[in-house]
Amino acid sequence: MRLFGKKPKPAKARLSLPRWMLARFDAAQTTKDNARHWSAAEFLSADAEADSNVRKILRTRARYEVQNNSYARGIVKTLADDTVGTGPRLQMLLEDEAKNRLVEHDFAEWAKRIRLAAKLRTIRMARCQDGEAFAVLAQNPRLSTNVTLDIQLIEADRVTDDEMNADGRSVDGITFDSFGNPVSYNVLKAHPGGTASFGTDSVTVKAENMIHVFRQDRPEQHRGIPEITSALPLFAHLRRFTLAVVSAAEAAADFAGVLYTDAPANGEADAVEAMDTIQLERNMLLTMPGGWKMSQVDPKQPVTTYGEFKHEILNEIARCLSMPYNIAAGNSSGYN
């Protein structure tokens, strides 16, 4: 029945979205509370994020921290010692035992002459604090062994691009083919920070003669960053907190005691010159001015939480290297 003489319009179908399409990730939301935290997050490629300038800053700071922080130095050195140990040993499994012993002896002699274990430890330390290590396979005529192959270590700062030779397939000194395989390395003749620098003079080393060691954290990443990068601010906090505790304890220890009085101002207490100092000697008998008392300063340092702070921050530092706390701290007293 038409009450107003018009045909009613058909109802429009309401679009019903699946429930999963209405979901959102909380971490993808930018609010006034988290905007500052995520302000440094950028959408860059692996090589752009770790370009030559960024890696130079990270290497410089990591080296500085390792040189001046005993915990950082110990962690890096322990990592290298535990990884390499006394060096690799060759075990031959041929049927001829005499040949096995001969080859094993020659390998051990060659490894000793080129200081293989020491160089491997240096490579592991460089990978941790510099992010990467380079080693050139070259013939050393001064070796007295039957095999004259030697390993020449190259610092990461020397493998870089000459501005005149940079192209699309070169990533800061490393040239790749269309499949991403390294073809050659551009190595400066001297360290750019050395006193005998040759400027941009460089040599080209073929990929088959170069060993490049680094940890690839992202696809299409071709250069390494220090493995302790995420821990560098924590190392700084550890040193600053330690210095603050020591400074507070020293400041409190500068005062053997303080004179005070309970008498009101202009009261019956003897007049004492403000900010006056008295030298105290051991086993001395001290008399106080009338109405005055002596009290020692409560230093409140070191704080009781100092040990807990060091434990937690060292544990956090060691996580970026997958190292247990007792190894990083060099202390297993709490494990027994």
Please provide the spans of the model-predicted regions:
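Structured, mid-chain assembly/scaffold modules that mediate subunit interfaces
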Residues: R63-Q216
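N-terminal start-of-domain structural block
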Residues: M1-T31, T200-R240
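Short N-terminal signal/transit or membrane-insertion segments
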Residues: R2-L15, E104-V147, P219-I225, S247-A269, ...
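Extended, charged amphipathic alpha-helical segments
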Residues: I211-N336
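Short, mixed-charge, low-aromatic patches
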Residues: Q29-R36, I57-Q67, G180, A196, ...
